[in-house]
């Protein structure tokens, strides 16, 4: 398997690199170093540094597991709920470009955003991070954001896939949903953004969907995301 950039040039021969890794190194690839880095396999694979970033980067001053309160100074852009009022994908794209410039300066590889959960309840504690209750508007703005960030070579993580519209018990809640509602409300924004902007990665949500956790939901991650939408990025 060959990993290529957006222009078709090969940047990594995955099979060759995997053949050089020990079993221990392969296992350590499944986890991280602290909360924000991937393991570099003793220098064989560049470490990926991630940071939160829907409306500005949050690089920690010091790397401590669970510590998210000591971020370095960075621009705080309007939240998704605020900038969505512009109805302007090009403006959101420019914001993405500005975030990417700050990420490059801090040697950040990937911004964990944008978040496109559909707003179904005003009680959701993270509604400010999401664009809208409208799947159409959300898809247009998310595409602009992803294209803006990735235009400068910084990766993105489209989140949270899927049917995650509450924070209360989000790790264990079970979103029971029929196919029509899933297709008409919760998936359109993801589908448009995945197909048009091709985000570097897609972040699975924590909740269960019809009894199955999103992170191991074959219907969502394989049947729809991989096979139907032809997504080839990381999950």
Regions found by a protein language model. Give the residues of each.
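Glycoside hydrolase catalytic-domain context in secreted enzymes
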Residues: 2-235
